[in-house]
UniProtKB/Swiss-Prot annotation:
GO terms for molecular function: 4 iron, 4 sulfur cluster binding; ATP binding; metal ion binding; oxidoreductase activity, acting on iron-sulfur proteins as donors; oxidoreductase activity, acting on the CH-CH group of donors, iron-sulfur protein as acceptor. It catalyses: chlorophyllide a + oxidized 2[4Fe-4S]-[ferredoxin] + 2 ADP + 2 phosphate = protochlorophyllide a + reduced 2[4Fe-4S]-[ferredoxin] + 2 ATP + 2 H2O. The lineage of its organism: Bacteria, Bacillati, Cyanobacteriota, Cyanophyceae, Synechococcales. Belongs to the BchN/ChlN family. GO terms for biological process: light-independent chlorophyll biosynthetic process; photosynthesis, dark reaction. Component of the dark-operative protochlorophyllide reductase (DPOR) that uses Mg-ATP and reduced ferredoxin to reduce ring D of protochlorophyllide (Pchlide) to form chlorophyllide a (Chlide). This reaction is light-independent. The NB-protein (ChlN-ChlB) is the catalytic component of the complex. Binds 1 [4Fe-4S] cluster per heterodimer. The cluster is bound at the heterodimer interface by residues from both subunits. This is Light-independent protochlorophyllide reductase subunit N.
Length: 428
């Protein structure tokens, strides 16, 4: 391993895992996510999702009051009452996620016991599961890891030979990848999370798992415990990473390399054409990735190898060396990879190095923009359909756009001076 692995601890600037509800509730329309938390939790999710509460979205918050926090009320009884009222009002709900938060964890509210009690009462009409979306020890993408980990014990068992893609993808991207795997020769492909929470994929010794996201560490471990084989491969961001990701599955299924190349070569050629205009803007530019989403290593690999950017520093909240081994191997020798965060120290390094672009959280973006440093919100990368060979151009555009916008603003503020074309003197 030729990269320079570093680690630091200190104050952090990240969203909590409740944010992942925004994409999970869209993925599984028959599920409901009930956060047990404070008004701050409710405001966060509603703002992040951009949904008015009167629209009756598939998430909500059971707000812990001062009496709950002080131990003057039985929070378990109140939670049961709220859950019953919710399920009575929304009979279409098939899976209810009880989601822990910082306040519920502080008062040691046992959501696992609540889920078990509700399951006994509902007798299979609704499946109730629980996980933690607290941000005390985790970053925002790990909320999905918690949700999927809660589903793994519910997956049926199978010995069938199949490929399981794990991690939320846009429906169109998932359909495209499934189609491409079929053309390669892998016909049995399923996904976790499924599009319906009641149609869980089966898992067993014949299951090969491809992670679509790098932050699903716990889910991967639980799937291994169920007998599945979890592949280690570059993640499907950019043409190169997506190709290697699909080739890893093809190799595991013992599919002829020429067959794989016949399907993927034209797609890669088209992706390189789509990348070309963005590479013109990004080539040679310096980028600093602050830790937030755990997508930073695959993004750094894509931006350096396919877009020609120079990596100043690559931060990541947590680093699973085994799971990220393929990504680390593709980074340039000497690349600084910083695990963890001391936000003040990292901002000092940003100011000292003056990169052309910084990938960071929304809370840091505006202050850095005010200092003249271009930024890209890391959360936008989670909400955008960026996976797969076909999406390489769109992924590059997310990074070229802020630089192009900054150049247009610079030109507008500093128009070229118009030379006088008449040689005659100008009279008042």
């Amino acid at each position: 391993m030729s990269v320079n692995l570093l680690k630091e601890t200190g104050p952090r600037e990240v969203f909590c895992g409740l944010t992942s509800i925004v994409w999970l509730h869209r993925r599984m329309p028959d599920a409901f996510f009930l956060v047990v938390g404070s008004r701050t939790c409710a405001h966060l999710i509603q703002s992040a999702a951009g949904v008015m509460i009167f629209a009756e979205p598939r998430f909500g918050t059971a707000i812990l009051s001062e009496r709950d926090l002080a131990g003057l009320a039985d929070a378990q009884d109140e939670l049961d009452r709220v859950a019953r009222e919710l399920l009575e009002r929304r009979p279409e709900i098939r899976t209810l996620f009880l989601v822990g938060s910082c306040p519920s964890e502080v008062i040691k509210l046992d959501l696992a016991r609540a889920a078990e009690r509700l399951n006994d009462e509902l007798r299979g009409r609704v499946q109730v599961v629980n996980y933690s979306g607290s941000g005390i020890e985790t970053t925002f993408t790990q909320g999905e890891d918690g949700a999927l980990s809660a589903l793994v014990p519910l997956l049926p068992s199978t010995d069938q030979r199949q490929l399981l893609m794990v991690g939320t993808l846009a429906d169109a991207v998932e359909d495209r990848l499934t189609h491409l795997f079929g053309r390669i020769g892998i016909d049995s492909v399923c996904s976790l999370p499924p599009r319906k929470s009641t149609e869980l994929p089966a898992v067993g010794p014949g299951t090969t798992v491809l992670l679509t996201q790098p932050y699903l560490t716990t889910t991967a471990r639980l799937l291994r415990d169920r007998g599945a084989r979890v592949l280690t491969a570059p993640f499907p961001l950019g043409a190169e990473g997506s190709r290697s990701w699909m080739e890893a599955a093809a190799k595991d299924f013992q599919i002829n390399a020429d067959q794989v190349a016949s399907v993927l070569d034209p797609l890669v050629a088209r992706a390189q054409s789509a990348l070309a205009p963005h590479r013109e803007i990004l080539n040679g530019k310096r980028i600093f990735l602050l830790p937030e989403s755990q997508l930073e290593l695959p993004l750094a690999r894509f931006l350096q190898r396919e877009c020609g950017m120079e990596l100043v520093e690559v931060g990541t909240p947590y680093l699973n060396r085994e799971q990220m081994a393929e990504e680390l191997a593709l980074l340039p020798e000497g690349t600084s990879v910083m695990e963890g965060q001391h936000v003040e120290n990292q901002l000092d390094r940003v100011r000292a190095t003056q990169p052309d672009l910084v990938v960071c959280g929304m809370g840091l973006a505006n202050p850095l923009e005010a200092e003249g440093i271009a930024t890209k919100w890391s959360i936008e990368l989670v909400f955008s359909p960026i996976h797969g060979i076909d999406q390489a151009g769109e992924l590059a555009e997310l990074f070229s756009r802020p630089l192009r916008r900054r150049e247009l603003i610079r030109q507008a503020l500093n128009p070229p001076s118009s030379a006088l074309i008449d040689s005659d003197p100008v009279h008042a």
